[in-house]
Amino acid sequence: FAIASTCSSSEFGTSYFQETNPIKLFSDCSGYNQIATTPAQFPRMLQGALQHAILKKEVAVLGIPGDLAASQPEENPTATFALPSRAIYRPLDSELQKFAELINSSERITIYCGIGAKEAHTEIIKFASMIKAPIGYSFKAKMAIQYDNPYEIGMTGLLGFPSAYTSMHESDLLILLGTDFPYEAFMPKECKIVQIDIRPERIGRRAKIDLGLGGDVKDTLQALFPLIYEKENDDFLQKQLKIYGKLKEKMAALADKKGSEKNIAP
């Protein structure tokens, strides 16, 4: 959420020194973008901006002219704290059954997590343990997914390791959890792909999806667990963890190398 200042409203449209138009400046990168010009507008617009930022997870921008910033505030006649209680959001049972059948019939499964999976760390670890799947993650999801995770194989993409890329391309089933990973070139073409996202309009815009499921990752996995059986063969998982381990050793060796005495290390 950003409050964008601009010149006094009396100077709008005069090419005044440092005059800006916040609407034009931020229209391409925001979901809520308004400019208040009266004290009565500002608190209502502020509430709307906060609700967009918190509830819709969109960038919100509220422009404020200099004269408005110096004026006396007015009481807000509408709500000032309107956060809904958490709702359960998951696919229909029939769709979950299709997902379970894909999992139960696959032998080489990789899980790839985005920031939309950040609240489901416990469920994702349990999921990976049941289906013997390595877990890759995006840069934004790293802090939420990597810790206390014995199944993690790092990131893919421009900042990633080859391990996650290799695992995704050697899978017969790739499961995308809460990710809008932007690089189509890094997505496998030969395996089946299932995508779960709380914003269904994002499903399928980075790869060809065999099954798209709208839902919260945590709610969806909790409902899925009774439908899948725990796999015993972990050969694929161990292979990918071994690849990741060797890559980490190689990176550590480069970092530990001191180089010449008078040069910057490494």
Question: Over which residues does each language-model region extend?
Answer:
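Glycine-rich beta-alpha junction loops
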Residues: 7, 64-70, 115-117, 141
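Anionic-ligand anchoring segments at beta-strand to alpha-helix junctions in alpha/beta enzyme folds, i.e.
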Residues: 91-92, 98-170
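Active-site-proximal loop->helix
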Residues: 9-28, 147-151, 204, 208
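Gly-rich Lys/Arg/Thr-decorated short loops/hinges at beta-loop-alpha junctions or inter-strand turns
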Residues: 9, 25-29, 72-84, 146-149, ...
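Phosphate/pyrophosphate-binding active-site segments
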Residues: 40, 63, 75-76, 87, ...
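Acidic, glycine-rich active-site loops and adjacent beta-strand->loop/helix elements
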Residues: 4-10, 140-144, 180-181, 199-200
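A short, gly/pro- and small-residue-rich
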Residues: 126-133, 184-202
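Structural signature of the thiamine diphosphate
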Residues: 2-4, 26-78, 102, 164-194, ...
